[in-house]
Amino acid sequence: MRASFDTNILVYAVDRAEERKHSLAVEVIGWASRADCIFTVQALGEFFNVVTRKTGLDLAEAEGFIDDWRSVFPVASATPNCLTSAIQAVHHHGLTYWDAMLWATARDA
């Protein structure tokens, strides 16, 4: 089964405010680099928004993290079919829309 990450894991990987979460996120991303894992455009975009607006990370530094991850992981974009699948997952499984979209994008990648 292919894995992907919610934005929070990516944020914790660069934000040292909560050291335990930071360490775990770095460890998990390291594991993922040796597994069948993708990143989504959605998660990378949300990461950029959060770390530059809420943690004060410099724009270039945030872009550097994204570039580094893109060199290691395939990056998938949502499709119209992902939209349909995400909406169905909200209806049938109670997921939030954005979590459902991450799931659908990773599944279809």
Where are these regions (language model features)?
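Active-site neighborhoods of divalent-metal-dependent phosphate/nucleic-acid chemistry enzymes
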Residues: 74-109
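Amphipathic alpha-helical segments within well-ordered protein domains
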Residues: 48-49, 70, 87
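Short glycine/serine- and small hydrophobic-enriched flexible loop segments
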Residues: 49-53, 107
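Short beta-strand scaffold positions
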Residues: 5, 39-41, 77, 97
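Structured helix-beta-strand junction loops
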Residues: 32-35, 71-72, 93
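Short, well-structured N-terminal submotif of metal-dependent ribonuclease cores
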Residues: 1-39, 54-67
